[in-house]
């Protein structure tokens, strides 16, 4: 009886692992169907009690695996651009731009996961699938991300994603008007405007 219980437990663990692997494979294959796209988005941030912290909106351009432009237009403008090697963050309000190597950027943020869509990243998560919804929980609890949810159709269109941090703050993004196809290469370059202070951390 004891051997049977142990065997059942082992098989159960194997089945769960296979389900997670299948979900990760399906998620990656769906995202692989669209190599580049543009979409507008709305943002809603709530605290651990569900109280509204911030509402925002902006535009997003992606060309996988490493080119992207995340342009927040409201409530405050900010720009996050990757040219494939350098990651630029620009805040027009304080007139400051920061440059870091993309390879040094954390890969455990929802946007980086979506933009990169690399198997090595997805392997860091336990993934459960319910139709078009994928719920990701980090295997390591050392980071700030507690849970990540993404809704992506079979055609690769991302409808929404959200992230819950360790303090239960939730950031939800609703994507709309996703246009799949070629994106102007200029969207993935950034030149600091004249007079802007540059914090270059690529050293």
Curated annotation (Swiss-Prot):
One GO cellular component term noted in the UniProt record for this chain: outer membrane-bounded periplasmic space
Main subcellular location: periplasm
Short name of any one Pfam family annotated for the protein: LolA
Keywords, alphabetical: Chaperone, Periplasm, Protein transport, Signal, Transport
Segment forming the signal sequence: 1-21
BP-aspect Gene Ontology terms: lipoprotein localization to outer membrane; lipoprotein transport
InterPro entries in UniProt: LolA/LolB/LppX, OM_lipoprot_carrier_LolA-like, OM_lipoprot_carrier_LolA_Pbac
Disulphide bond pairs: none
Localisation: Periplasm
Subunit structure: Monomer.
Function: Participates in the translocation of lipoproteins from the inner membrane to the outer membrane. Only forms a complex with a lipoprotein if the residue after the N-terminal Cys is not an aspartate (The Asp acts as a targeting signal to indicate that the lipoprotein should stay in the inner membrane).
Family: Belongs to the LolA family.
Record-linked NCBIfam families: lolA
Protein name per its UniProtKB record: Outer-membrane lipoprotein carrier protein
Organism of provenance: Klebsiella pneumoniae subsp. pneumoniae (strain ATCC 700721 / MGH 78578)
